[in-house]
Amino acid sequence: MKMFGPGIFAVTVVVAVVTWVSVAQSQDAQPVVDANGNMHVPQDYLRTYRYLGTWAVLADEGQGAKQLHVVYASPGAVDAFQKIGRFPDGAVLVKEVFEAANEQMTTGMVGHAEALKGWFVMVKDSKGRHPGNALWGNGWGWSWFDAGDPLKTTSTNYKTDCLSCHVPAEGSDWIYVQGYPSLKQ
Protein backbone atom coordinates (compact mmCIF):
# COMPACT_ATOMS: atom_id res chain seq x y z
CA MET A 1 0.00 0.00 0.00
CA LYS A 2 1.34 3.42 -0.99
CA MET A 3 1.36 5.83 1.98
CA PHE A 4 2.67 9.01 0.35
CA GLY A 5 1.98 10.01 -3.22
CA PRO A 6 3.37 12.99 -5.11
CA GLY A 7 0.40 15.15 -4.04
CA ILE A 8 1.02 14.60 -0.32
CA PHE A 9 4.73 15.29 -0.80
CA ALA A 10 4.00 18.55 -2.66
CA VAL A 11 1.55 19.70 0.03
CA THR A 12 4.10 18.88 2.74
CA VAL A 13 6.79 20.90 0.95
CA VAL A 14 4.44 23.88 0.45
CA VAL A 15 3.37 23.83 4.12
CA ALA A 16 7.02 23.67 5.23
CA VAL A 17 8.03 26.59 3.00
CA VAL A 18 5.04 28.74 4.03
CA THR A 19 5.76 28.03 7.70
CA TRP A 20 9.44 28.89 7.27
CA VAL A 21 8.64 32.16 5.44
CA SER A 22 6.04 33.15 8.08
CA VAL A 23 8.46 32.46 10.91
CA ALA A 24 11.29 34.28 9.14
CA GLN A 25 9.13 37.34 8.51
CA SER A 26 7.76 37.46 12.04
CA GLN A 27 11.25 37.07 13.50
CA ASP A 28 12.57 40.01 11.47
CA ALA A 29 10.78 42.49 13.74
CA GLN A 30 10.76 40.45 16.96
CA PRO A 31 14.20 41.49 18.20
CA VAL A 32 13.45 45.12 17.33
CA VAL A 33 9.97 45.52 18.87
CA ASP A 34 8.67 44.56 22.33
CA ALA A 35 5.07 43.66 23.20
CA ASN A 36 4.17 47.34 23.77
CA GLY A 37 5.57 48.44 20.41
CA ASN A 38 8.75 49.98 21.80
CA MET A 39 11.55 49.70 19.25
CA HIS A 40 15.32 49.66 19.36
CA VAL A 41 18.10 49.51 16.79
CA PRO A 42 18.75 45.87 15.87
CA GLN A 43 22.11 44.90 17.32
CA ASP A 44 23.31 42.85 14.36
CA TYR A 45 21.96 44.86 11.43
CA LEU A 46 25.39 45.56 9.91
CA ARG A 47 26.09 41.83 9.74
CA THR A 48 22.68 40.44 8.80
CA TYR A 49 20.74 43.19 7.00
CA ARG A 50 21.00 44.00 3.30
CA TYR A 51 22.35 47.34 2.15
CA LEU A 52 19.70 49.32 0.23
CA GLY A 53 21.40 52.57 -0.68
CA THR A 54 22.91 55.86 0.44
CA TRP A 55 21.52 59.36 0.27
CA ALA A 56 23.71 62.48 0.37
CA VAL A 57 22.07 65.53 1.89
CA LEU A 58 23.79 68.48 0.24
CA ALA A 59 25.55 71.19 2.20
CA ASP A 60 23.48 74.31 2.86
CA GLU A 61 26.10 76.42 1.07
CA GLY A 62 28.87 75.55 -1.33
CA GLN A 63 29.70 72.06 -2.51
CA GLY A 64 29.68 68.76 -0.70
CA ALA A 65 27.34 67.04 1.70
CA LYS A 66 26.25 67.84 5.22
CA GLN A 67 24.89 64.34 5.94
CA LEU A 68 24.98 60.82 4.55
CA HIS A 69 22.02 58.48 5.10
CA VAL A 70 22.92 54.79 4.72
CA VAL A 71 19.92 52.44 4.63
CA TYR A 72 19.62 48.70 5.34
CA ALA A 73 16.70 46.23 5.15
CA SER A 74 16.08 43.16 7.30
CA PRO A 75 16.72 39.68 5.87
CA GLY A 76 14.18 38.74 3.21
CA ALA A 77 12.71 42.25 2.88
CA VAL A 78 14.37 43.06 -0.46
CA ASP A 79 13.48 39.69 -2.00
CA ALA A 80 9.87 40.14 -0.89
CA PHE A 81 9.78 43.69 -2.27
CA GLN A 82 11.05 42.48 -5.63
CA LYS A 83 8.29 39.86 -5.75
CA ILE A 84 5.29 41.81 -4.41
CA GLY A 85 6.27 45.46 -4.97
CA ARG A 86 6.16 46.48 -1.30
CA PHE A 87 7.84 45.68 1.98
CA PRO A 88 6.22 42.73 3.77
CA ASP A 89 4.72 42.93 7.23
CA GLY A 90 7.52 42.78 9.80
CA ALA A 91 10.21 44.18 7.48
CA VAL A 92 12.67 46.43 9.31
CA LEU A 93 14.53 49.37 7.74
CA VAL A 94 17.49 50.96 9.51
CA LYS A 95 18.89 54.30 8.36
CA GLU A 96 22.25 55.41 9.72
CA VAL A 97 22.66 59.19 9.70
CA PHE A 98 26.24 60.45 9.54
CA GLU A 99 27.60 63.96 9.67
CA ALA A 100 29.64 64.43 6.52
CA ALA A 101 33.06 65.96 6.06
CA ASN A 102 33.98 67.49 2.70
CA GLU A 103 37.33 67.88 1.05
CA GLN A 104 38.84 68.56 -2.32
CA MET A 105 40.35 65.47 -3.94
CA THR A 106 41.67 64.70 -7.41
CA THR A 107 38.14 63.70 -8.46
CA GLY A 108 36.66 66.97 -7.19
CA MET A 109 34.87 67.97 -4.00
CA VAL A 110 33.86 64.85 -2.08
CA GLY A 111 31.85 64.19 1.05
CA HIS A 112 32.47 61.24 3.33
CA ALA A 113 30.95 59.88 6.51
CA GLU A 114 32.39 61.38 9.66
CA ALA A 115 30.45 61.03 12.94
CA LEU A 116 27.33 58.92 13.45
CA LYS A 117 24.42 61.17 14.54
CA GLY A 118 21.97 58.33 15.07
CA TRP A 119 19.59 55.83 13.51
CA PHE A 120 16.09 55.96 12.14
CA VAL A 121 14.22 52.65 12.38
CA MET A 122 10.99 51.73 10.61
CA VAL A 123 9.06 48.47 11.06
CA LYS A 124 6.34 47.54 8.56
CA ASP A 125 3.04 46.95 10.34
CA SER A 126 0.19 46.35 7.93
CA LYS A 127 -1.93 44.85 10.73
CA GLY A 128 -1.98 47.83 13.11
CA ARG A 129 -0.58 45.87 16.07
CA HIS A 130 0.13 48.86 18.31
CA PRO A 131 -2.81 51.29 17.96
CA GLY A 132 -2.21 52.87 21.38
CA ASN A 133 1.46 53.62 20.72
CA ALA A 134 2.09 57.08 19.21
CA LEU A 135 5.11 55.79 17.27
CA TRP A 136 2.96 53.49 15.13
CA GLY A 137 0.70 54.44 12.25
CA ASN A 138 0.31 54.71 8.50
CA GLY A 139 1.44 51.09 8.24
CA TRP A 140 4.77 51.52 10.02
CA GLY A 141 6.51 51.85 13.36
CA TRP A 142 8.76 54.96 13.36
CA SER A 143 11.63 55.84 15.75
CA TRP A 144 14.76 57.98 15.91
CA PHE A 145 17.69 56.96 18.16
CA ASP A 146 20.59 59.25 19.00
CA ALA A 147 24.09 57.86 18.51
CA GLY A 148 25.28 56.23 21.70
CA ASP A 149 21.85 54.96 22.74
CA PRO A 150 20.42 52.44 20.26
CA LEU A 151 17.97 51.17 22.87
CA LYS A 152 16.06 54.38 23.71
CA THR A 153 14.17 56.37 21.12
CA THR A 154 13.92 60.13 21.38
CA SER A 155 10.78 60.11 19.20
CA THR A 156 7.49 60.68 20.98
CA ASN A 157 4.94 60.80 18.15
CA TYR A 158 5.51 59.67 14.58
CA LYS A 159 3.06 62.26 13.22
CA THR A 160 5.08 65.19 14.57
CA ASP A 161 8.58 63.69 14.70
CA CYS A 162 8.79 61.58 11.53
CA LEU A 163 5.92 61.78 9.06
CA SER A 164 6.57 65.25 7.63
CA CYS A 165 9.85 64.13 6.05
CA HIS A 166 8.08 61.21 4.38
CA VAL A 167 5.04 63.03 2.93
CA PRO A 168 6.59 63.22 -0.58
CA ALA A 169 6.93 59.40 -0.46
CA GLU A 170 3.35 58.70 0.64
CA GLY A 171 2.55 57.15 -2.74
CA SER A 172 5.28 54.54 -2.28
CA ASP A 173 4.24 53.51 1.24
CA TRP A 174 6.21 56.36 2.86
CA ILE A 175 9.57 55.03 1.59
CA TYR A 176 11.80 56.81 -0.96
CA VAL A 177 12.24 53.66 -3.02
CA GLN A 178 13.83 55.47 -5.98
CA GLY A 179 17.11 55.66 -4.04
CA TYR A 180 17.41 51.90 -3.63
CA PRO A 181 18.62 50.22 -6.84
CA SER A 182 18.49 46.74 -5.29
CA LEU A 183 14.68 46.98 -5.09
CA LYS A 184 14.47 47.25 -8.89
CA GLN A 185 16.46 44.11 -9.73
Spell out what each predicted region is.
Residues T19-V21, E99:
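N-terminal low-complexity, intrinsically disordered patches enriched in charged
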Residues A10-T19:
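Bacterial N-terminal signal peptides
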Residues D28-N36, V41-T54, L58, A65, ...:
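Sequence context surrounding c-type heme c attachment/ligation sites in exported
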Residues M1-G7:
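Positively charged n-region of N-terminal signal peptides that target proteins for export
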Residues L68-V78:
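Short, structured beta-strand/loop micro-motifs enriched in basic residues and often containing a Trp
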Residues A24-S26:
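Boundary at the C-terminal end of the N-terminal hydrophobic targeting segment
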